[in-house]
Amino acid sequence: MDSSNLSSSMPQEGQLKLTEEAIITIKQVDESSAKRSVSNESRKSKDVTRKEQIASDQQGDDQCPQSDTAKDKKTEFKQDEVPNSNGKSIPTFHPCNNIGINDFNHQHYSRVCRNGIDINLIVVGESSLGKTTFVNSFLQSNDTNFRPKKTMDFVEHKATLSDGDQKFNLTIVDTPGFGDKSDNSNCWRPIATNLLHRLNAYFQNEVKMDRETSEIDSRIHGCLFFINPNGHRLQPLEIYIMKKIDQFVNIIPVIGKADTMTSDELNHFKKRVIADMVREKIRYFREPHNEKKAKIPIPFAIVGAGAPIEHDGKCIRGRAYPWGLVDIDDPKQSDFCQLRNFLLYTHIEGLKHKTHKLIYDTFRTEKLVALNATPGSQFISAEEMNQKYISEQTQLVEEALTKVMKEKYREKENNLELLETNLKTHHKDYKHALKKRITALEEEKNRLIKEIGPEKVKKAGILA
């Protein structure tokens, strides 16, 4: 009995020992997992703290305080099931309370107010269209006697305009006229070179390993192309230059010296300009949905302002004529205010977006494709890219000119051959008529000799 009890108690002691070992092992595993979880939590807390510090450094004053409901309450989501095209339901979650997304506009506005909006413009057009006067008026400068040193000098005007809390870092590049030479086939090159140099500078900084993120964007966002009002439509030289530069910049057509036309003539001229640009497939900047809403009068009709004029106790920016005054700030007399609102308020984001997403991306793709096409290629400087691009464009222009010259030579040669044939025919006819005349005179001579008599003729010495 005792032996049986002893024998029966032996497995229980063995089982008890195994259970204690298992408990010890489980405790060790729990302790190691607890230590691991504590280390993970500390690591996560450090990462979160680091991310919060970076975010706070980047945002600065842009971080807006969340509402009390967002602080005190946890974000709760409501689940809905929306059927898809296959008939299966897809769970969709909607926040039940404020999660801070509605503060994004205020954060963006605060950042823009602190840093300001950078916008770069270039003024292009023929001479004596009031480009420099427009720049001074736009920048609210009284320096109306400023003139560029040379005909093709590029002059940068920089200014900071403010409207309440909003600041505009404005840069306008003045190009003092084209089309003054007898040969204007290459007058577009300085403009295109300047635009390409700015695109290349941005591209070169982008492809560098240690690129400067704080570098100011020098790309041109809009080209104010001044159109000559003397005529019924766009001039061939204006169309030629627009086609050459529309792939590098947003073209904004502007009619200079619009006070030389009546309102009816101006409206008719605007329609003709747009029709010519559409017919010639010139890519000018437009946003149809914004233009209908804001009633944008493209192309803009601009009147230059001279010295300030005092009228009825007010200082007016405009021009004085014998028949009255022209106020450039009056929307009924000039589109100056509409153009300023167009550039600074209604379409500034559209200009910058198209410059970066369309013009620069196309330029960047072409450069990268050309770079990867060369075996063993590496990133080259912007100056070399610019020279290569200009050489390619020059070769294309030379080929086009060679083709045109060959056609003109062939046409001239055909005209000369036709003229030679006409001259030969005329000479043959003249020679035949001359022979007939000689024959007729010989016959008349013989007849006279017979009538007078040979002896009398010989005696008188009439005919030798």
Curated annotation (Swiss-Prot):
List residues binding GTP. 125-132, 151, 177, 257-265, 304, 319
Q: Where is the composition biased (Basic and acidic residues)?
A: 41-54, 69-81
Q: According to the record, what induces this protein's expression?
A: Expressed during meiosis. Expression is under the control of the meiosis-specific transcription factor mei4.
Q: Which GO biological-process labels does this protein carry?
A: cytoskeleton-dependent cytokinesis; protein localization; spore membrane bending pathway
Membrane topology category: Peripheral membrane protein
Keywords attached to this entry: Coiled coil, GTP-binding, Meiosis, Membrane, Nucleotide-binding, Nucleus, Sporulation
What's the domain of life for this entry?
A: Eukaryota
Coiled-coil positions are: 396-453
Q: Which GO terms describe its molecular function?
A: GTP binding; GTPase activity; molecular adaptor activity; phosphatidylinositol-4-phosphate binding
> G3 motif: where is this region?
174-177
Q: What does this protein do?
A: Septin-like protein involved in the correct orientation of forespore membrane extension during sporulation.
Instruction: Note the PANTHER family from the entry.
Output: SEPTIN
Q: How does it assemble?
A: Component of the sporulation-specific septin complex composed of at least spn2, spn5, spn6 and spn7.
- Any idea what this protein is called? Septin homolog spn5
What species is given as this protein's source?
Schizosaccharomyces pombe (strain 972 / ATCC 24843) (Fission yeast)
The record lists the lineage as:
Eukaryota, Fungi, Dikarya, Ascomycota, Taphrinomycotina
